[in-house]
Amino acid sequence: MKLIRGIHNLSQAPQEGCVLTIGNFDGVHRGHRALLQGLQEEGRKRNLPVMVMLFEPQPLELFATDKAPARLTRLREKLRYLAECGVDYVLCVRFDRRFAALTAQNFISDLLVKHLRVKFLAVGDDFRFGAGREGDFLLLQKAGMEYGFDITSTQTFCEGGVRISSTAVRQALADDNLALAESLLGHPFAISGRVVHGDELGRTIGFPTANVPLRRQVSPVKGVYAVEVLGLGEKPLPGVANIGTRPTVAGIRQQLEVHLLDVAMDLYGRHIQVVLRKKIRNEQRFASLDELKAQIARDELTAREFFGLTKPA
C-alpha cells in the first residue's frame, strides 16, 4: 500500500485513475471492511486501484474539539489495518483552515477529477464537503454525470439488528464490554504508541512501567486492565495497564502505563501495541502512595488470575 501524504504530493496518485472512498475509518471496523471489500470488487471490474481518502486531523477535531469523539485508532494503526484490507493507496489530507475553505466545486473538479481521476466513488449519503459544508451527495451525483464517474452511497452495516459503527464501538468500550467491541471491530481493541521516559514513580514503588503518552488524543477507555503487549518478541507478553491521568500524584495529561508480568526489559523508544483483555477497575485516587502500591499489587494478582499465572517466588 502506498501512502500519499498531503495534496501537495498528488503527483504520486495513480495515473490511470482509481476507485475511491472518503471517510475517517476510525477503528477500521467490520462495517468499514465490508465497504472496502465492495470497493475492491469495483476496482477489479474496472482494473483500477482502490484508494481511501482520510483527513488529519479529523474535521471535528479542528472545528469542535470539545465535541470530537475519542479516537479508536491512531493513524499508524489505521494505515496498517487498511493495508490488511487490500487498499492500494491512502491519501492523507492535512485538514486545516485552508483546505476547509476549498469550495465544493473545486473539491470535485480539481481534487477528485483532475488529480485523482476518480472513476467510482463511495461515500455516505450524509457526506458533506467544501467550504461551509456546501457540497452534498446530490451535488456529487450531478458531478458524476458531468465528469463521467459512478457514485454510490455506502450502506450502514448491520448484523443481528446491531449497527456496526465507530460510535457503537465507543459505546461498547464505555460500557466495559470488550467482547462486544472486539466483535464489532473484527479484532481486539488495542492502544499503540512509543514508550517514553516517565517520572519512574512505578519503579520506586516496585512496579516499573512503560509509559506511552496519548498526546492530544482523548482515550475511549479509562481504568486498569489486564493486557497483552505486542511488539516485544514473537509472543504477546501479559501485563497490567492503567489508562488515565494518575490522580493520586496529581496527574493532568492522559497516558498509558504498562507493567509487564515476570519480564524485565528496557522498553524506551520501542513501539508497542497494548491489547486490552479484561477491565479490572476504574481509575481512582488514593490518599497515599502506600495505598496505591497495595492496590496495584491486588490489580497484578487479578491480572495473574486472568492469565492463569502464578506469582514468582
Curated annotation (Swiss-Prot):
Highest taxon of the lineage: Bacteria
Stored CDD domains: FAD_synthetase_N (cd02064)
GO biological process, alphabetically ordered: FAD biosynthetic process; FMN biosynthetic process; riboflavin biosynthetic process; riboflavin metabolic process
E.C. number(s) listed in UniProt: 2.7.1.26, 2.7.7.2
InterPro entries recorded: FAD_synthase (IPR015864), Riboflavin_kinase (IPR023468), Riboflavin_kinase_bac (IPR002606), Riboflavin_kinase_bac/euk (IPR015865), Riboflavin_kinase_dom_sf (IPR023465), Rossmann-like_a/b/a_fold (IPR014729)
Catalytic EC class: transferase
Pfam families cross-referenced by the UniProt entry: FAD_syn, Flavokinase
Metabolic or biological pathway: Cofactor biosynthesis; FAD biosynthesis; FAD from FMN: step 1/1; Cofactor biosynthesis; FMN biosynthesis; FMN from riboflavin (ATP route): step 1/1
Molecular function as annotated in GO: ATP binding; FMN adenylyltransferase activity; riboflavin kinase activity
Catalytic activity: riboflavin + ATP = FMN + ADP + H(+); FMN + ATP + H(+) = FAD + diphosphate
Keywords (A to Z) from UniProt: ATP-binding, FAD, Flavoprotein, FMN, Kinase, Multifunctional enzyme, Nucleotide-binding, Nucleotidyltransferase, Transferase
Function (record text): Catalyzes the phosphorylation of riboflavin to FMN followed by the adenylation of FMN to FAD.
Family stated for the protein in its record: Belongs to the RibF family.
Protein name, per record: Bifunctional riboflavin kinase/FMN adenylyltransferase
Taxonomic source organism: Escherichia coli (strain K12)
